[in-house]
Curated annotation (Swiss-Prot):
Binding positions (Mg(2+) 1): 300, 313
Role this protein plays: Cell wall formation.
Organism: Geobacillus thermodenitrificans (strain NG80-2)
Span of domain ATP-grasp: 141-346
Cofactor binding mode and count: Binds 2 magnesium or manganese ions per subunit.
EC code(s) of this entry: 6.3.2.4
InterPro entries attached to this UniProt entry: ATP-grasp, ATP_grasp_subdomain_1, D-Ala_lig_Van_CS, D_ala_D_ala, Dala_Dala_lig_C, Dala_Dala_lig_N, PreATP-grasp_dom_sf
Binding site for Mg(2+) 2: 313, 315
UniProt name for this protein: D-alanine--D-alanine ligase
NCBIfam families: D_ala_D_alaTIGR, PRK01372.1, PRK01966.1-2, PRK01966.1-4
Pathway(s) this gene product operates in, as recorded in its UniProt entry: Cell wall biogenesis; peptidoglycan biosynthesis
Gene giving rise to this polypeptide: ddl
C-alpha cells in the first residue's frame, strides 16, 4: 500500500511564491510507485484548500493555486481526527505524513509544526522549537554563541528601540560593527528585506526596509570571503553532504540571485581544503544539535580570506527549486532527488514513532 503524503505549501508569508516553486519540484520528483500525493494549498489570505490526489506532472505553479471553489479545509477540527492520527474523515483520504514546504513566517517558524503536533500527525522536517529558533536569527545566533561556534559580530534592534533611540541606534551600529554591514529582518528567509550598508544613509534606508517584514532586525558585520553551504539530514545521527559554494553575480546573495536562473553560480563540491571541510562538517553537526534540529537543514558559512570558518545561519526548510543548493548538494553526495525525499519522509515517520513512546499522563 502506498504512503499518502500531504504536501503543504503556499502560506501567508512573503515567501509564498518560493513555496509554490518548491512544492512543484517536490511533487514532480516524488516516486509515484511508493507515494500518493495530496496537495494542500494555503492561500496568501490563510485559507486552507485541499486538492485532489495528484495523478500527473505539475507543469506550472498556477496549477497549484486552487481557488475557493475547491474543497476548503478547517485546519483544526478534532472530530475529524481518528485515533490513528489521520487528517481527514474517510479512510480513502487518510494522510499518513505531511510534507510542509512552507517558507518564512506562518510556516517555517514553528506555527504549522505546532498544529501538526496537536493533530498527532507525522511531518517532515524540524519540530516546533527548532523551527522557531531557526527562523529567528537573533535567538539562533545567541545559541550559536552559547555553543561556542565562531560567527560574525551582530547587533539586534527592535522597532520600538529604533523609534525611541533615533540617531543613537545608528551610532551604536557604527561603533560596534562599522561598515560595511548587513541589515536583515530577524524572522524572514530567502534574503527577503536584506540590505548591504556602506554609510549611515544606507543604514536608515535598510532599517525602514527590514522593519516592513518584522518588528525585530539583526545587523551583522561583513565578512570578506566566500559563501559555503552544506546539507545535513538525520535525527539523532545526522550526516553531512559535500560542501558547495555560492558565487552570486550580484554584490551579495539576495532574493533575485537565489530564485532567478543565471543570477548565481553554484560550485559543487566547493574548492576547500580537507581541513576546512572537516571544520565545516563539525560546526554544522554542532549547530544541528545545539538547535535540536531533526530531519533536515542547510547550514551556511563564510570562509574568510585567511581561511577562518564562520557559521552564518541554518535553514530548517531549505528550498527544493531547480536552482536550490540543498538537493544539489545531496545529488553530488550520491543521493538522487527522489531518494532524498523518500529519506526525509522515512525520518519523519521514525521521529513520530519515537514520540508515540512518550508517556503524557502521570499517576502516583
Amino acid at each position: 500500500m502506498k504512503t499518502r503524503v500531504g504536501v503543504l505549501y503556499g502560506g501567508k508569508s512573503p515567501e509564498h511564491q518560493v513555496s509554490l516553486s518548491t512544492a512543484r519540484a517536490v511533487m514532480n520528483a516524488i516516486d509515484p510507485h511508493k507515494f500518493d500525493v495530496i496537495p494542500i494549498y494555503i492561500t496568501p489570505e490563510g485559507q486552507w484548500i485541499k486538492g485532489k490526489r495528484l495523478t500527473g506532472t505539475v507543469e506550472e505553479v498556477k496549477q497549484l493555486q486552487f481557488t475557493s471553489t475547491a474543497t476548503a479545509m478547517i485546519p483544526v477540527s478534532l472530530n475529524q481526527v481518528p485515533a490513528s492520527g489521520s487528517a481527514t474523515e474517510s479512510d480513502e483520504e487518510t494522510i499518513d505524513v505531511i510534507f510542509p514546504l512552507l517558507h518564512g513566517p506562518n510556516g517555517e517558524d514553528g506555527t504549522v509544526q505546532g498544529l501538526l503536533e496537536m493533530l498527532n500527525l507525522p511531518y517532515v522536517g524540524n519540530g516546533v522549537l527548532a523551527s522557531a529558533v531557526g527562523m529567528d536569527k537573533v535567538v539562533m545566533k545567541n545559541l550559536f554563541a552559547q555553543a561556542g561556534l565562531r560567527q560574525a559580530k551582530y547587533v539586534s534592534v527592535t522597532k520600538y528601540e529604533w523609534k525611541k533611540g533615533g540617531e543613537a541606534v545608528y551610532d551604536r551600529i557604527e561603533q560596534e560593527l562599522g561598515y560595511p554591514c548587513f541589515v536583515k529582518p530577524a524572522n524572514a528567509g530567502s534574503s527577503v528585506g536584506i540590505s548591504k550598508c556602506k554609510q549611515r544613509d544606507d543604514l536608515k534606508t535598510a532599517f525602514a526596509e527590514a522593519f516592513k517584514y518584522d518588528r525585530k532586525i539583526i545587523i551583522e558585520e561583513s565578512i570578506v570571503g566566500r559563501e559555503i553551504e552544506i546539507g545535513v539530514i538525520g535525527n539523532d545521527e545526522p550526516i553531512c553532504s559535500v560542501a558547495g559554494e555560492i558565487v552570486p553575480k550580484k554584490e551579495f546573495y539576495d532574493y533575485e540571485a537565489k530564485y532567478e536562473d543565471g543570477q548565481t553560480e553554484l560550485i559543487i563540491p566547493a574548492n576547500v581544503t580537507e581541513e576546512q571541510y572537516e571544520t565545516i562538517k563539525s560546526m554544522a553537526i554542532a549547530a544541528f544539535k545545539a538547535l535540536d534540529l531533526s530531519g533536515l537543514a542547510r547550514v551556511d558559512f563564510f570562509l574568510a580570506e585567511d581561511g577562518t570558518v564562520y557559521i552564518n545561519e541554518v535553514n530548517t526548510m531549505p528550498g527544493f527549486t531547480p536552482y536550490s543548493m540543498f538537493p544539489l548538494l545531496w545529488q553530488h553526495s550520491g543521493v538522487p532527488y527522489s531518494e532524498l525525499i523518500e529519506r526525509l519522509i522515512a525520518l519523519a515517520l521514525e521521529r513520530h514513532q519515537e514520540k508515540q513512546m512518550i508517556t503524557y499522563t502521570f499517576e502516583k
